[in-house]
């Protein structure tokens, strides 16, 4: 699939397996989601631009590399996306954080927006939009719509697991947005849940039902 990157690193896949396990408790689930987000952030920033600068080491002056180009932003889709936020910030502590609040209507399966708060300089940033699951694609599409309406021009989407239906929908709605996923799953079931999936990420992160 164009613009879809499946992160097959052994550590990512090992941790994702434990995340999927129904016997993994809330504390371990939360810690593992955080760890996988950090590992995926390493991959998602692989194409960031560098420039040469002069640095004084204790022994001499040398030419070294430093990040340049777009400033970064992280936008978790509330509430489950919060579980991935800090893992990314460990690698990119200077990134600004915005939030998009959406919930899925369990009857229509459509997302409903209830909160949006973004940095003021959205047009200058590359945003990493995060949500543990990409099911129908509705929430991701609406979140990216929200950013674009407010001036954002550069975005990537990161999730732990995705259904092919959601990937297709997001690609069709926003072909300019690259998708990074740890596990590309089999399908959506008749209730709109990813199979095999990992259950309800929000409930498992926060210990709710």
UniProtKB/Swiss-Prot annotation:
GO BP terms: UMP salvage; uracil salvage
Binding positions for 5-phospho-alpha-D-ribose 1-diphosphate per the UniProt entry: 79, 104, 131-139, 200
Annotated binding of uracil, by residue: 194, 199-201
One of the Pfam families matching this protein, by short name: UPRTase
Top-level EC class: transferase
Superkingdom of source: Bacteria
Cofactor: Mg(2+)
UniProt name for this protein: Uracil phosphoribosyltransferase
Protein's organism: Listeria innocua serovar 6a (strain ATCC BAA-680 / CLIP 11262)
Originating gene: upp
């Amino acid at each position: 699939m164009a613009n879809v990157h499946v992160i097959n690193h052994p550590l990512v896949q090992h941790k994702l397996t434990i995340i999927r396990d129904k016997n993994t408790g809330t504390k371990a689930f939360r810690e593992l989601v955080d760890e996988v987000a950090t590992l995926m952030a390493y991959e998602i920033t692989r194409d960031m631009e560098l420039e040469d600068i002069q640095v004084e080491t204790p022994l001499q002056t040398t030419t070294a590399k430093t990040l340049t180009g777009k400033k970064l932003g992280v936008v978790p889709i509330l509430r489950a996306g919060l579980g991935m936020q800090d893992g990314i910030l460990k690698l990119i502590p200077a990134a600004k954080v915005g939030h998009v609040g959406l919930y899925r209507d369990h009857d229509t399966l459509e997302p409903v927006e209830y909160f949006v708060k973004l940095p003021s300089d959205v047009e200058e940033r590359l945003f990493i939009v995060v949500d543990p699951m990409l099911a129908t694609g509705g929430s991701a599409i609406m979140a990216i719509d929200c950013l674009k309406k407010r001036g954002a021009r550069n975005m990537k989407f990161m999730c732990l697991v995705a259904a092919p239906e959601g990937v297709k929908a997001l690609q069709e709605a926003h072909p300019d947005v690259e998708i990074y996923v740890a596990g590309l799953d089999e399908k959506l079931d008749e209730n709109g849940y990813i199979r095999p999936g990992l259950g309800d990420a929000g409930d498992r992160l926060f210990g709710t039902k």
